[in-house]
Amino acid sequence: MYAEDKFREIYNREPETSFCPYRVCPLGAHIDHQFGPILGFALDYGVHMAYGVKNNGIVELMSMNFPKRVQFHVASVPETKEGDWGDYLRGATKALSEKYKLTKGLCGVIRGALPSGGISSSAAVTICFMKALAKVNDIELSDSEYIYLAKKAENEYVGVSSGKLDQSCETLCRKDNILYMDSKDDTYRNIPASSNIKPFKIGIFFSGLERNLASSAYNNRVDECKAAAFALYSYAVTDRRGDYELKDGLKFQDMRLRNIPEEIFKEFGVRLPTSWQKRCNHFYSEMHRVEKGVGCWEKGDIVSFGRLINESGMSSIVNYECGSPWLIKLYDILSKLDGVYGTRFSGAGFKGCCMALIDPDKADEIKEIVEREYLKEFPTLKGKYKAYICSTSTGVGKAEGDRF
């Protein structure tokens, strides 16, 4: 049953609709929160919402994916999170209400088309709901507002130290393009697929294990990167201040690895704890992979582009030290298969899924082999492991009407 049908069943009227696509990031993983550049696609799967206005200001929403109906008033959002999926709705309402006057609520049904974990379902839920809440209150949000407010909701209310990657891809992407965005200054461009590029699809291979980003090691990795940046900054200021162009008076909370030239890491990185050195190695090498990836994409060289994705995946394992036995097994299987141009963890990379760029003619064969080999290793996940073949899509901010 779809969200529209469920809404009609519950409320006995026709709904309005809202949609936000999921996203994948082939290159630029784990560096957006350090102000690095990213490359991303929006997918033709996403979060759908059927809703109707409530003039009394009450928000009443049920999910077809998670238990518990969420209910609150737009003027009295709980100050602290409750630890359920409704936190994203509460956070979105709070962020929106700090900028605009909200008088109307809504009732509705929300449904994610794919399992959660690794495709930015949390940002998609946040944006999909925010779009609907803004509409019933006659608020028209710009692309930058979608990105800023959805990020604010996750950072300040839900408690996830995410960057702008998820919200940017889900808002700004265009079909048959790859989004290049520099998280340092928010400049971006959609780069069309070259006429020379081989046909490809985006495979999403779910481990069968969902993850809670806020309670994972994600925030710890962000803090390690910031700590490494602050330490490198301190070493450079103390020992070689005149040799580098560095801003004065940077505070820890404002520190990012993008503030630190790679030359400083090469000179002083040996002083860092081993784990921090690894985080830096991932950041700087991923920056280079993104720039190389742009060149490959513009030339239509998907084979070389795929190799960079594989390298990114390995760096996530070795240097960023994310992953799990399940995701690493999926990565190992996919990276060796004929017809897979490149693969890596998607999202935080602790449970979730792997994404892969694949040859469409070999999609069925790839799905069959991955399922067989993965379930041979983890037989208890039969029925939970899932695979989907997706195409690129247009982000919510660029869409011409709702796609439901």
Predicted regions and their residues:
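C-terminal nucleotide
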Residues: M1-L27, H48-E82, N177-G342, L357-F404
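Gly/Ser-rich oxyanion-binding loop with an adjacent helix/lid
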Residues: M1-P37, Q71-S76, K81-I197, K336-L337, ...
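Short Gly/aromatic-enriched secondary-structure transition segments
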Residues: F35-A42, R221-V222
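A short, compositionally biased micro-patch
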Residues: A42-D44, K54, R174
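FabD-like malonyl-/acyl-CoA
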Residues: A123-T126, C353-I358
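Glycine-rich phosphate-binding loop
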Residues: F350
